[in-house]
């Protein structure tokens, strides 16, 4: 599948950054939060996984902490007798050693505290739903325990995973078809913030949102419990902030003061330049929508002005996913383009990679969701993205020349990379240029040569050789 033509705004941005100087000139640095739950939460695979992530240049983790997993008597309809604010009354399991190891390595940790929840902490335990109307007061006390347990080791607290998605919070819509989850979530966010304050954290660094990329604004017809409807992220934002469709205050809600608004802007098979038709959806190619919405919310005094955007979960689905997967070579290209888009936006504070290893594919006919966004297949064999992730590269056609952007993720300071090109029909790469990065490892270059593909080679100070995959122009 050929790469699609880039959006005009992106071409303009790349054109401004392209030129003879080889050092990147972006105005901000980004965290890249890596998430590999199956491997990192297992004591068997954690050491080798940490070793792999260090080689890849990872220095920040996103960890999802399930309230249900650590709570006492989580499947009981009756709340047990315990001190919900005391960390000693919970079973933290493998979260403790993982967070301790990340702290020892000096890695930033985003801890997203989320569903499923204890059955006794729902509004109606008889429903046997672990995501329906969680009790905000109970959540506040739990967050006090979380804050006391991990203060000093966690850099950011994410409040709920994808609260606009029916698998993580119910109900999403009221019986009349209007969104229900935004107001439920607002209560949970405020409870979490108060709980962290009660833990002795004077100014908790929290992320609000963590929204799934697409959904609906209104649902027609009767809404049944458990129906698979999700609230569109911008409609969700307005509901959380008590704003009407024109971003005017629609109630007596006070301003919220999070550290940033978090999104999960997954694209579809069309790739990272895809812009959804629904103007309420947010993919990586539509970041302008979220920054515009945050500006309007700031103008309405529902949020602080110029709030930063955090991409906290992201990946490009590859084959063998039957529905959304792209070829694995294209996965590496698309992932680099997505990171380039995020890097180019000064309001974006972080990027993310969801999964080191693919989920196993479910059998045909199964309704189970599986992600093939990893750097490796489920078997552990590498995809091109395993080589591309530490040294992402994008190549954009600009008239008769090409604008190149790259990043040496494992570098700790300015370094030199070797740019190689492959002419059409040659099947061999030759050296085109030696490029100096900035102190964070980023670089740009204008290349007048006509190549079929490009790649980056870098040798670390310790002698490890990194060779990225072949990348085509787009």
Please describe what each predicted stretch is.
Residues 17-24:
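C-terminal segment of classical bacterial N-terminal signal peptides
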Residues 1-10:
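Bacterial N-terminal signal peptides that target proteins for export
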Residues 43-47, 136, 140, 180-329:
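Noncatalytic carbohydrate-binding groove/subsite architecture in carbohydrate-active enzymes
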Residues 441-445:
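Short strand-edge motifs at loop-to-beta-strand transitions and within beta-strands
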Residues 56-227, 268:
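Substrate-binding cleft and catalytic face of glycoside hydrolase catalytic domains
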Residues 34, 61, 102, 146, ...:
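Conserved, mostly hydrophobic/aromatic
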Residues 77-78, 149, 163, 168, ...:
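Aromatic-rich peripheral "rim/lid" segments of glycoside hydrolase catalytic domains that contact
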Residues 26-60, 64-66:
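Boundary/entry segment of secreted carbohydrate-active catalytic domains
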